[in-house]
A protein has these predicted regions:
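Positively charged, low-complexity, intrinsically disordered RNA-binding extensions
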Residues: 139-251
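N-terminal cationic and glycine-rich segments that engage phosphates or anionic surfaces
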Residues: 1-116, 121-125, 130-139, 208
Length: 251
């Protein structure tokens, strides 16, 4: 299992605390608002909105919160005006990072990100310096007990997925961006509900980190993900799960 999916699995377990859940709700609400602003408030004709709503329901977000976020996005309710922005940077050991944020003040977060990254052994990079290290892909996670590997393979590959991996606690499915909805529909027809499904930035290659660099990398990712304006952090590290767990537990 790659460092990318190992981190996602551990992060999902950590999100169970109330403080983490509050941040998850904030991020999902902002994603719903942005999706509705860009593609309209009807999830049937707006795949990004449909995916964001699924993320909210997976976190047990109340329907009224989802509906208000949609209305703010379409302009039917007043609310803050968010801007989507992506920053590029390097972490310990030359790990490439993409930081996707939704903010009301781009200038403010540039300084905040620069401080967080430099404090943890990295630096911000110019636009284009890191982006080429990643592919835009669909990512779906399905509970392990939902189906056997053979059945999952039949369903997702026939629907257009690129790959199916065992990530320990679930099935990790990678799709071309344009096939994400079709694979989700195929899973739904088979009675399978994903834990998550989203467009992501998947590393082309991974950089192995150990020891102090591994610990510093985990702390950097945590610090960025705890920033209120950060939606996602993508990084091409590969760290043994035991080292990730140790670093998470030390914080």
């Amino acid at each position: 299992m790659s460092g990318h999916s190992k981190w996602a699995t551990i992060k999902h377990k950590k999100a169970a605390t109330d403080a983490k859940r509050g941040r998850v709700f904030t991020r999902v609400i902002r994603e719903i608002t942005i999706a509705a602003r860009i593609g309209g408030g009807d999830p049937n004709s707006n795949p990004r909105l449909r995916t964001a709503i699924l993320a909210g329901k997976n976190e047990n977000m109340p329907n009224e919160n989802i509906e208000r976020a949609i209305l703010r996005g379409t302009g039917q309710l007043e609310g803050e005006q968010y801007e989507e922005v992506t920053f590029e940077g390097y972490g310990p050991g030359g790990v490439g990072m993409l930081i996707a944020a939704v903010t009301t003040n781009r200038n403010r977060i540039v300084g905040e990100f620069r401080h967080l990254i430099s404090k943890n052994g990295g630096n911000l990079a110019e636009t284009g310096a890191v982006g080429w290290m990643f592919h835009r892909k669909g990512e779906i996670v399905v509970p392990k007990e939902a189906a056997s590997e053979d059945k999952m393979m039949d369903i997702v590959l026939e629907a257009g997925a690129d790959d199916l991996k065992d990530d320990g606690s679930g099935w990790y499915i990678v799709t071309p961006p344009e096939a994400l909805e079709k694979v989700k529909e195929a899973l739904a027809k088979a009675g399978i509900t994903p834990t998550s499904a989203e467009i992501s930035m998947v590393p082309q290659n991974y950089i192995k980190l150990t020891g102090a660099q591994a610990t510093q990398m985990v702390r950097l990712i945590e610090a960025l993900e705890e920033h209120d304006d950060v939606q996602h952090v993508y990084a091409n590290f590969d760290i043994d799960e035991s080292e990730i767990q140790a670093a998470v537990g030390a914080n």
